[in-house]
């Protein structure tokens, strides 16, 4: 609540609306900021986007050092100075997690609240003496600027990237995408065409990402359907509608989704972890009645120890 300490020095009669952030996507936070803008109208309002920057600037800091820490803070300060709000939306989530930041979503909401506004930045300071980054920058509204519809520009850019990816999808991914799109729109399971490659049985995982973030992932260690095609259909529906970590995918999200399908090979025992390569092999770990699986080539998993 540091900003309120200074605010109270100059203002005595004001009301505060405290808003929490979420684990939702950058664009969702931006849209929320636009809702704030609409609700505020022409009222006299000060929006404080509060939050620390990286917590990993020094070895002797509370969270240690990661090279992503100083890089994140540098990018944020540069974005502030240049009023580059698009940068708030385009950080790689693996990168920001490594940087251990906590202010980015507040900045995304602020950017949405200033949508299509002509702004002038007032950069004041940055420091990180204790291993945590602290910065101060204000933005003055100087009029309207229709070219600063950052949210729409970001959405268009994201959908263009997804379109390019879709052009190179294989039969497995196309089946998963068709299944998801049909189920989300119609709530009906499709009857798949079973190609020669999909006639055999195998475990399958279907993963869904949106804006670089996991949006759903469900799979089977061992086959439970008559063929791979049916395995994909059932797991695609579960991934988009039954993953307990996420809300069901909506029709508005369909154009933003990146989908992957992993068809599991034969399970083999591991005699020596030195034979493992996380970029080639997945791994199943069992303990008592519990069992977990890591797919190969996961973001943020670069070594066997990871």
Give the ranges of each region predicted by the language model.
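A glycine-rich, aromatic-flanked flexible loop/lid motif
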Residues: 50-51, 81-85, 150-151, 203-214
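Flexible, D/E/H-enriched segments
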Residues: 1-34, 60-171, 248, 252, ...
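Structural signal for hydrophobic packing residues in well-ordered secondary-structure cores
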Residues: 40, 80, 84, 114-118, ...
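Basic nucleic-acid-binding interfaces
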Residues: 155-306
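Short gly/pro-enriched beta-turn/loop segments at secondary-structure junctions
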Residues: 11-14, 40-44, 50-51, 132, ...
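Short, electropositive, low-hydrophobicity segments enriched in small/polar residues
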Residues: 55-56, 107, 137, 220-223, ...
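Active-site beta-strand/loop microenvironment that shapes enzyme catalytic pockets
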Residues: 20-72, 208-228
């Amino acid at each position: 609540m540091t900003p309120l300490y200074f605010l109270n020095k100059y203002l005595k009669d004001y009301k505060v609306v405290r808003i929490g952030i979420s684990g939702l996507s950058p664009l969702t936070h931006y849209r929320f900021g636009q809702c704030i803008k609409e609700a505020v109208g022409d009222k006299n309002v000060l929006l404080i986007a509060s939050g620390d920057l990286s917590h990993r600037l020094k070895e002797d800091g509370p969270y240690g050092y990661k090279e992503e820490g100083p890089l994140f803070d540098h990018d944020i300060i540069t974005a502030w100075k240049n009023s580059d709000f698009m940068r708030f939306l385009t950080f790689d989530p693996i990168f920001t997690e490594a940087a251990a930041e906590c202010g980015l979503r507040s900045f995304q909401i602020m950017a949405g609240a200033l949508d299509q506004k002509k702004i002038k930045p007032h950069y004041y300071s940055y420091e990180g003496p204790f291993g945590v980054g602290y910065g101060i920058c204000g933005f003055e509204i100087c009029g309207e600027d229709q070219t600063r519809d950052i949210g729409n520009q970001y959405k268009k850019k994201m959908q263009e990237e997804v379109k390019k990816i879709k052009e190179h999808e294989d039969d497995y991914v196309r089946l998963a995408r068709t299944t998801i799109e049909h189920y989300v729109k119609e709530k009906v399971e499709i009857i798949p065409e079973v190609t020669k490659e999909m006639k055999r049985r195998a475990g399958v995982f279907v993963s869904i990402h949106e804006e670089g973030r996991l949006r759903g992932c469900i799979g089977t260690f061992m086959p439970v359907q008559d063929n791979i095609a049916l395995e994909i259909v059932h797991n695609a529906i579960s991934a988009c509608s039954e993953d307990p970590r996420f809300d069901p995918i909506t029709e508005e999200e369909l154009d933003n989704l990146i989908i992957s399908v992993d068809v599991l090979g034969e399970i083999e025992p591991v005699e020596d972890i030195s034979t493992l390569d996380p970029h080639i092999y997945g791994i199943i770990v069992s303990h008592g009645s519990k069992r977990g699986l890591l797919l190969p080539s996961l973001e943020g998993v670069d070594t066997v120890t990871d």
